[in-house]
Regions:
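Bacterial Sec-dependent N-terminal signal peptides
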Residues: 1-23
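Carbohydrate-active catalytic/glycan-binding domains of CAZyme proteins
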Residues: 21-322
Length: 322
């Protein structure tokens, strides 16, 4: 009997140890990250949002169709799949749609999570629309609202930003990606209210990612070279509406073979770090694309740098990333 009990104890102990062994203490940059079940994380072109004790990572899932998938984590390294928020079955307008770069913010007035994204219908990029979906629960399926061209402008690569005063803004590439447009959203975040600026007309920039640090907003973008990486650049401004500085190079000539998708502030009890999140695209098999998490550094209030690290360890309690 004692031998039997011992065997049972050993079995559960080994099972516990195997689970513990899977807990990540660092992420290997440039690889396809995996979730807590060992499955590849499909959340490309994604954004992040903290709700309660969890960070949510919402992005493109291209393995079986074109979904918008949701993952959550308490430490930004160990991720749990929570489901698909949008699929081609969610709405008739999505039955042949390609969704890219979904971003989600929360509206305190309407109690809704609001998603904006790049919408295409079919195989090419001729539709060039923005699209919107909403949900009262970040882990539950979103309701598709509409797709449209903001004030008649094309809309491709995009990002969404909620400012400290609750106002929200949408950045997107327009005019065949030659211009970066900036719009202020309506109070419920489900439409554009005003076109604020055309940033760097003719600059041919895409993949916008925005963050505010201190008195300055920083906007990072990439050039337009299809799935091939290129020189990342950034600009800064004391006002989101501008004037914005000239574009400056950051990282190496290929952004370490990645393209920007988000800048995540990591607010801890000792410091605040800012994480660059990029996709390392595989243009032939999108779902095999890798990810890059790197800490941004600031030499002064308006100078931002990005250096390569093979791996990164994140401490959400202290706010340190190294």
């Amino acid at each position: 009997m004692m031998k039997y009990i011992c065997l049972i104890f050993c079995f559960f102990a080994l099972g516990y140890m195997s689970v513990e062994a899977q807990t990540k203490t660092a992420l290997i940059n440039g690889t396809s990250f995996t979730d807590n079940e060992g499955k590849v994380i499909n959340a490309h072109g994604g954004g992040f949002l903290k709700v309660g004790n969890y960070y949510y990572w919402i992005g493109e899932n291209r393995k079986q169709g074109v979904f918008v998938s949701c993952y959550r984590s308490k430490d930004l390294m160990n991720w749990e799949f929570r489901g698909d928020l949008l699929t081609r079955q969610s709405h008739p307008e999505l039955d042949s749609a390609n969704i890219e770069r979904p971003k989600v913010i929360y509206n305190l007035k309407t109690k809704q999570f609001v998603m904006w994204m790049h919408y295409e219908y079919g195989r090419d990029y001729s539709y060039a629309r923005a699209a919107i979906a909403t949900s009262s629960d970040i882990e539950k399926p979103f309701t598709f609202v509409k797709s449209f061209r903001p004030f008649g402008n094309m809309s491709r690569d995009c990002t969404l930003y909620k400012d400290q005063d609750g106002s929200a803004y949408f950045f997107s590439s327009a005019r065949e990606n030659y211009d970066m447009m900036l719009y202020k959203l309506t109070d419920d975040y489900t439409d554009v209210k005003k076109q604020i600026a055309t940033l760097w007309p003719g600059g041919h920039r895409e993949a916008p990612a925005l963050v505010k640090r201190g008195k300055y907003y920083f906007l990072m973008t990439s050039g337009c070279t299809g799935w091939a990486p290129n020189q990342a650049m950034y600009a800064f401004s004391k006002s989101i509406s501008g004037p914005w500085s000239e574009l400056k190079n950051i990282a190496n000539s290929t952004a370490f073979d990645s393209q920007s998708t988000f800048i995540l502030p990591l607010v801890g009890n000792k410091t605040t770090s800012y994480l660059y999140v990029g996709d390392r695209w595989d243009g032939k098999q999108y779902f095999k694309s890798g990810y890059i998490f790197l800490p941004l550094t600031f030499e002064n209030d308006s100078t931002m740098t990005l250096n390569w690290r093979d791996k990164i360890s994140i401490d959400v309690k202290t706010g340190k990333a190294k």
